[in-house]
């Protein structure tokens, strides 16, 4: 038996022993701190079953202290969230398959069926939850359990509303920043392009039932592009700004104060023509923009927020040991907590590997995503997404 198999068997054994303790003893005989410690060691789906035990234990499991403690324990096991999106044209929907990936194991989490989008959709993963946006319909999913909550329809005359999910650790609160979009035709460098400009800006705090949508006092239209990244309670995203919308800027939304502003311009040497090949991400605790190079390497612009004038530091890394044809199919999805770059394919295949590159040691490692079972998505072109820092959460149970 390998070391990883031994650890997995011991984990299953410990979980089974914890469950037997709860079954054999009356809860009145189990000290509260002992019961909570047992819950902490269980998989999230097992914890969910105990919600039906009593109102008292449901309140304990849904308490802020238990939720945050459960996630802290889960974060001690570094994993990725792998998503395969299967387009089902017959039923006019999408099936999202969630898996967690450790250094040695691929584990199936859940499946969620989403309505087929009439407009471009965006997904953002933050602190255990993932947001989906379809036109004006928004909902949040817990990949650990497959449970979702549908948000109220965005109140706007626009047809498309782009959203970014963020988490405020100080107030333990998730919020959606929603940009209501309108199209604008623009001539640029002799070409005509269609931009999606924000016309209204709203915020949706999760868990607020009465009048959840709130308008934000920010009236400057801008055209958001790329993904977003949430760092220490602040959301960042890139957008076209300025009167002629030719300037690329980094936008900032403080989740605590709910203030949206233009934070800084992108670096002067930033190759805007290849914008959609970039990933906005966290790099060693800082905001960064990263892309692959033609010569099997990575370039990353890191924002220095400590300087009097916010500046960007460019770093270049040459990767050895990866074949060019394989490197071309990879996309930078983020970094691990230790600073490794994560690269993954955009579509499922039977040899789906996630590549990790450590810029400090210039070393590579890879992990294969082993998908066992007769899933339909394995037999056709299926979109793939990989998110760093996957944690189990008991939210939305």
Curated annotation (Swiss-Prot):
Protein name (database record): F-box protein At4g11590
Keyword field: Nucleus, Ubl conjugation pathway
Cross-referenced PANTHER family: BNAA05G37150D PROTEIN-RELATED, F-BOX PROTEIN CPR30-LIKE
Keyword Transmembrane appears in the UniProt entry: no
Major subcellular location class: nucleus
Pathway(s) it belongs to: Protein modification; protein ubiquitination
Source taxonomy: Eukaryota, Viridiplantae, Streptophyta, Embryophyta, Tracheophyta
Keyword Repeat among UniProt keywords: no
Domain F-box, chain residue ranges per copy: 24-70
Pfam families (alphabetical): F-box, FBA_3
Alphabetical GO biological process terms: protein ubiquitination
Source organism of the structure: Arabidopsis thaliana (Mouse-ear cress)
InterPro entries: F-box-assoc_dom_typ3, F-box-assoc_interact_dom, F-box-like_dom_sf, F-box_dom
Coiled coil (UniProt feature): none
GO-annotated cellular components: nucleus
Primary role: Component of SCF(ASK-cullin-F-box) E3 ubiquitin ligase complexes, which may mediate the ubiquitination and subsequent proteasomal degradation of target proteins.
Comment field on protein domains: The F-box is necessary for the interaction with ASK proteins.
Assembly mode: Part of a SCF (ASK-cullin-F-box) protein ligase complex. Interacts with ASK16.
Localization in the cell: Nucleus
């Amino acid at each position: 038996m390998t070391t990883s198999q031994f650890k997995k068997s011991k984990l299953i054994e410990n979980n089974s022993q914890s469950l037997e303790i709860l079954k054999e003893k009356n809860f009145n005989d189990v000290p509260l701190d002992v019961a909570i410690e047992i819950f902490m060691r269980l998989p999230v789906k097992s914890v969910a079953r105990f919600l039906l035990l009593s109102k008292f234990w449901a309140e304990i499991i849904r308490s802020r202290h238990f939720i945050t403690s459960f996630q802290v324990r889960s974060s001690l096991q570094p994993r990725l969230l792998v998503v395969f999106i299967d387009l089902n044209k017959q039923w006019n929907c999408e099936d999202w398959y969630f898996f967690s990936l450790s250094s040695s194991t691929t584990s199936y989490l859940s499946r969620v069926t989403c309505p087929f989008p009439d407009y471009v959709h965006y997904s953002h993963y933050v602190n255990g939850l993932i947001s989906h946006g379809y036109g004006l319909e928004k909902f949040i999913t817990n990949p650990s359990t497959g449970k979702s909550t549908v948000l109220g329809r965005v109140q706007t005359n626009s047809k498309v509303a782009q959203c970014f999910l963020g988490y405020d650790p100080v107030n333990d609160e998730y919020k959606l920043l929603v940009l209501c979009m309108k199209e604008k035709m623009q001539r640029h460098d002799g070409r005509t392009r269609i931009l999606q400009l924000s016309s209204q800006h709203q915020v949706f705090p999760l868990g607020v039932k009465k009048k959840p949508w709130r308008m934000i006092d920010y009236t400057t239209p801008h055209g958001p592009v790329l993904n977003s990244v949430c760092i220490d309670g602040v959301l960042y995203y890139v957008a076209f700004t300025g009167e002629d919308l030719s300037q690329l800027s980094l936008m900032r939304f403080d989740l605590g104060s709910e203030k949206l502003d233009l934070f800084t311009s992108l670096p002067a040497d930033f190759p805007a023509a290849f914008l959609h090949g970039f990933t906005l991400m966290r790099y060693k605790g800082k905001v960064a923009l990263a892309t692959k190079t033609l010569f099997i390497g990575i370039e990353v612009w890191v924002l220095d927020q400590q300087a009097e004038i916010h500046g960007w530091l460019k770093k270049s890394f040459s990767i050895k040991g990866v074949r060019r044809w394989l490197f071309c199919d990879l996309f930078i999805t983020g970094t691990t907590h230790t600073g490794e770059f994560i690269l993954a394919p955009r579509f499922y295949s039977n040899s789906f590997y996630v590549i990790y590159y450590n810029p400090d040691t210039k070393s590579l490692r890879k992990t294969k995503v082993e998908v066992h079972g007769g899933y339909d998505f394995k037999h056709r072109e299926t979109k793939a997404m990989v998110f760093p820092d996957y944690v189990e959460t008991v939210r939305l149970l």
